[in-house]
Amino acid sequence: MMETYKRGLAEATGWLVFLSLLMVLALAVPKTVFDADSKDFILLIGAVGIWRYSMGGVHFLRGMLFLHVVYPYYRRRVRQLGSAADPSHVFLMVTSFRIDALTTAMVYRSVIREAIDSGYPTTVVCSIVEMSDEVLVRSLWEKMNPPDRVSLDFVRIPGTGKRDGLAYGFRAISRHLPDDDAVVAVIDGDTVLDHGVVKKTVPWFKLFPNVGGLTTNEFCEVQGGYVMSEWHKLRFAQRHINMCSMALSKRVLTMTGRMSVFRARVVTNPEFITDVENDHLEHWRLGRFKFLTGDDKSSWFSLMRLGYDTFYVPDAAINTVEHPPEKSFIKASRKLMYRWYGNNLRQNSRALKLGARRLGWFTMLVLFDQRVSMWTSLLGLVVAILASLKYSIAFLLVYLLWIGLTRLVLTLLLSLSGHRIGPAYPLILYYNQIVGALVKIYVFFRLDRQSWTRQPTKLERGLASFQRWFNAWSSRAMTFSAASIFVAVLLTIV
């Protein structure tokens, strides 16, 4: 009780400080800014971001429509199916590597509990590297004593990355010869399942015969400081709305590695297994290279290529235990952004080549926006800085006031997602916009550079010395050229 009171008081103080800063900024800007007849009127500063705000607004409206109207209708239809929607068999596959014993115990305890409580014939498939994990799982298994319809299968894998772990697990499931009504849940080694998540996810495959995979809502517990914790929670709130928006078209853009559920005939398809295990890109400048990370994007692309739909179940929740890769928030967030945005951009260009007939026009528009957002996100800040240097500091003050007000509104809208909001969200939103855009630009010209945050595995391509030199220097040259053109164009406009 006391902890809740202290947290509430701290958050109230944070909101008061943020609102006070907005008032100070409002007092600092010229009075003409608030004059609707003035050329400096505050809303003009938002014109440069009209594309970004319109895309965000469309996602929000679509997300709320799905969450509060469409999904409840679908859920009623699923409940009407009753036991007819039950799968013939459920496989719960967990991949674990270099995760602490406490987290591993929490994860497997939740998985075994779900296998018992679901009532379905279930096989828990443990894709593991270390013997200590096997000993821990066997101990939990004996303690929880599941019924005969629940079985345990261990798959020992080399510690060469998650892709290999998934492929070994998929092949192990193939040896069980699952039928067309069987489903497979792929669960990360740091994901704790909420009560009832299996029963909430598996019936959807009967309602939607063409859905090949679906993913779930995420909440998190962060093993880090306050800002790092809020940063992750904000990300999951934004993810929830975007997932709901894309689920309206049955085109959810990623099969989240933390927990996604597939038809068994998908994960046992040799093409799908190859796509996940040996995904690669043929780049015009960087050559051919394998994907080290981003198995969630590879599985999504494979589903699209094979002709399946994707879906999102917002009331099926999982809880992830986040371990930041660095103690410093700046370093940790940059490292995570580098991996996430790299995975995103590596899939983007080839996803667009699937075309509107396969993806739909809205999905094509979203994929296009992912490519241009790295520049549009920086537009307002760069214009404000140039205008303040060329004309008056008032332009920068107006811009900062605009950012404060709009991020406050965005934060309040995020509360409608069902995720908790905090006073740090407006600042973190802007941090994500600017730093995220810079990271995207950097990684866009270096798509071949990949590494894990949990293990020291890096992509080794065995290139000749000249090819390595050419890739490095051409990446620098293209980054500098693109940034120079961007600034030069804005200088001619301002």
UniProtKB/Swiss-Prot annotation:
Membrane topology label: Multi-pass membrane protein
Associated pathway: Glycan biosynthesis; alginate biosynthesis
Gene Ontology, cellular component aspect: plasma membrane
UniProt EC number: 2.4.1.33
Keywords: Alginate biosynthesis, Cell membrane, Glycosyltransferase, Membrane, Transferase, Transmembrane, Transmembrane helix
Enzymatic reactions: [(1->4)-beta-D-mannuronosyl](n) + GDP-alpha-D-mannuronate = [(1->4)-beta-D-mannuronosyl](n+1) + GDP + H(+)
Catalytic class of the enzyme: transferase
Cellular compartment(s): Cell membrane
Transmembrane intervals: 12-34, 49-71, 381-403, 423-445
Record keyword Transferase present: yes
InterPro entries in the record: Nucleotide-diphossugar_trans
One biological process term in Gene Ontology: alginic acid biosynthetic process
SUPFAM superfamilies on file: Nucleotide-diphospho-sugar transferases
A GO term for molecular function: alginate synthase activity
Pfam families: Glyco_tranf_2_3
Role, per record: Processive enzyme that polymerizes GDP-mannuronic acid.
PANTHER family (alphabetical): HYALURONAN SYNTHASE (PTHR22913), MANNURONAN SYNTHASE (PTHR22913:SF12)
Family (UniProt): Belongs to the glycosyltransferase 2 family.
Protein name: Mannuronan synthase
Gene encoding the protein: alg8
